[in-house]
From Swiss-Prot:
Protein name: Cold-responsive protein kinase 1
All residue ranges annotated as the Protein kinase domain in the record: 41-320
Biased composition (Low complexity): 354-390
One MF term in the entry's GO annotations: ATP binding
Induction context: Accumulates upon P.brassicae oviposition and in response to bacterial elicitors (e.g. flg22 and elf26).
Length: 390
């Protein structure tokens, strides 16, 4: 027999309260504290909105600035992600992960309190036009540090935490930046724990097209190599300064991975580097980063390096075996997602001069990314994302 919305909601609230109570190292905030911190959730303090609620900037009683994510009461799917995020992030700390201050589970309120990060996310800054739109200067040194920082954060999740953690939604909008442009991986609502002695987990596919590894998107088989694929896409976005998909570009330039492979085969990868750097970058290092991106996005998961190896490759501690670089795996090889265009003949630099990054270009997700702290569950419900078992 089914239950009424009210009785189901009460049972759900009780279950959430029970799970939160079982977590020892999570600070529980009173709802009135949250109201005071946000000036009663004033419009001036609202910094974003996603499919599962809103995010506010707040000042806690101890003077700390916080990003306060309020889960919508109408969202039932979001409760699962709410609990997942608390369970995952409350147990771990790393300089390249967001820090959870605590939560509020008073009555029907479900609120997460994070450290506030001043410079938003990569998709709202670098991929939205860089300095021109965000006021942030992403020189080559800053980009390299961001790439290495994200890689270190993922290596920590994949290899140092027990059980290992697969993030499942690595993308530009989930990489937040502090005032020093140090990257923090955020949004653990879709994260999965990898039990010991298991090679993969079969699960409902969730994430964002453009970052999804083909074997995961098509078969639902999740391993750490799916995160590594997503990182490879992100790495190429950071170096090129463009999203993995940009429909405002000519057809032959729209898909970043295909473009990178074409240029790699012609030994012209340097043409993919962001022209916004005005030639002020280490060409050898930039091309090495792009080749690492190709390594991470190879069709066979077994050929993708581990994240600790990626860190060593990025920092130059390990040389790239160029013989191991093969064509990247593309979902479009398995599913009819797009119409292919002709092979490009012009260089990327000419293309970059004629077609700059528009603010409306797509990075694989159709939702408003003004909410850099929005729940990963939103990704699963965006118009161009997967959210079904395949």
């Amino acid at each position: 027999m089914g239950c009424s919305w009210l009785s189901c909601h009460r049972r759900e609230a009780t279950e959430v309260d029970g799970e939160i109570a079982a977590i020892d190292n999570v600070k529980i905030y009173k709802y009135r504290e949250i109201r005071q911190a946000t000036d009663d959730f004033s419009a001036e303090n609202k910094i974003g909105e996603g499919g599962f609620g809103s995010v506010y900037k707040g000042c806690l009683k101890d003077g700390k600035l916080a990003a306060i994510k309020v889960l919508s009461a109408e969202s039932r799917q979001g409760v699962k992600e709410f609990l997942t995020e608390i369970n995952v992030i409350s147990e771990i700390q790393h300089e390249n992960l967001v820090k959870l201050y605590g939560c509020c589970v008073e009555g029907n309120h479900r609120i997460l309190v994070y450290n506030f990060l001043e410079n938003n996310s990569l998709d709202k800054t670098l991929l939205a036009g860089g300095y021109t739109r965000s006021g942030i200067q992403f020189d080559w040194s800053s980009r390299a540090n961001i790439c290495v920082g994200v890689a270190k954060g993922l290596a920590f999740l994949h290899e140092e935490v027990r059980p290992h953690i697969i993030h499942r939604d690595i993308k530009a909008s989930n990489i937040l930046l502090d005032k020093y442009l140090s990257p923090k991986i955020s949004d653990f609502g879709l994260a999965r724990l990898m039990p010991p002695n298991m090679t993969h987990v079969s699960t409902r596919v969730a994430g964002t097209i453009g970052y999804l590894a083909p074997e995961y998107a098509v078969r639902g088989q999740l391993t750490r190599k799916a995160d590594i694929y997503s990182f490879g896409v992100l790495l190429m976005e950071i170096v090129s300064g463009r999203s993995n998909k940009n429909t405002r570009l000519p057809t032959e330039y729209q898909y970043l991975l295909e473009r990178a492979w074409e240029l790699y085969e012609r030994n012209e990868l340097v043409d993919l580097v962001d022209s916004g750097l005005n030639g002020v970058f280490d060409a050898e290092e930039a091309c090495r980063y792009l080749k690492i991106g190709l390594l991470c996005t190879q069709d066979s998961p077994k050929l993708r390096p581990s994240m600790s190896t990626v860190v060593r490759l990025l920092t130059g501690e390990k040389d790239i075996d160029y013989k191991k670089i093969s064509r990247p795996g593309l979902i479009s090889d398995f599913m009819d997602l797009k119409v292919r265009g002709p092979v490009a003949t012009k260089t990327e630099q000419v293309n970059r001069q004629n077609y700059t990054n528009p603010s409306s270009s797509s990075n694989g997700s159709s939702r408003d990314h003004s909410n850099a702290y929005s729940s990963g569950a939103s990704s699963a419900n965006a118009g161009n994302t997967f959210s079904s078992t395949i």
